[in-house]
């Protein structure tokens, strides 16, 4: 099996696992269910992930990497002044790919309910990002409000609580972006 074909299969498996968690809940995440949803035999799934824990580790690692990499990419591609770049990228990444966010949230939920120690990598990456946000030239209080608002929005999206219509969500995002400009250090 070629590397790209192997990587494609892994993506299919991870997407299937995330879909099961999102649609049916953590308790329904079994190797059999993932294999079926991914269109593979259980042996085919086991070739890539030798156990349910290996699959969960793969989910957390893959989606954590993708999420934080998307933030870094936005910062790298930003041609404006350095003030607020990390905070702006955090806002943009958090709302630009809701499909990625849903998959990351599925991975984090599975880890939280099956083996919370698997969240350590995510926590480390989040702490690194938090350091960058707090040293971004934006008032630390505004950064904290922005971060907690995004985390709250993410929580709301994960659990389907108080969904915002498109207009309100866009106004919310605009308000967060305006807070970057307010009281810059």
Short names for language-model regions:
Residues 1-7, 185:
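N-terminal intrinsically disordered/low-complexity leader segments
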Residues 114-115:
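Short loop-to-helix capping motifs
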Residues 16-20, 93:
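Short amphipathic alpha-helical elements of helix-turn-helix/winged-helix folds
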Residues 10-15, 27, 49-72, 76:
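An amphipathic alpha-helix adjacent to DNA-recognition modules
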Residues 90-94, 105-109, 146-153:
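Short alpha-helical scaffolding segments that buttress acidic/His motifs in well-ordered protein cores
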Residues 12, 20-54:
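Helix-turn-helix
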Residues 58, 72-105:
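Hydrophobic alpha-helical connector segments
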Residues 118-123, 127, 132-185:
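Hydrophobic/aromatic-rich alpha-helical bundle segments in the mid-to-C-terminal region
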């Amino acid at each position: 099996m070629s590397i790209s074909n192997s990587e494609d299969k892994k993506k299919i498996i991870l997407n299937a696992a995330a879909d099961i968690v999102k649609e049916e809940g953590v308790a329904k995440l079994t190797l059999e269910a993932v294999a079926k949803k991914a269109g593979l035999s259980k042996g085919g799934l086991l070739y890539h992930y030798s156990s349910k824990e290996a699959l969960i580790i793969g989910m957390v690692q893959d989606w954590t990497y993708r999420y934080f990499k998307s933030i870094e990419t936005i910062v790298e591609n930003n041609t404006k002044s350095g003030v607020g770049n990390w905070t702006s990228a955090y806002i943009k990444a958090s709302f630009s790919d809701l499909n990625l966010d849903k998959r990351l949230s599925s991975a984090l939920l599975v880890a939280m309910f099956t083996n919370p120690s698997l969240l350590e990598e995510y926590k480390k990456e989040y702490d690194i990002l938090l350091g960058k946000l707090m040293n971004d030239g934006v008032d630390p209080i505004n950064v904290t409000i922005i971060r907690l608002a995004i985390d709250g929005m993410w929580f709301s999206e994960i659990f389907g609580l108080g969904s915002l219509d498109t207009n309100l969500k866009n106004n919310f995002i605009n308000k967060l972006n305006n807070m970057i400009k307010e009281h810059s250090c």
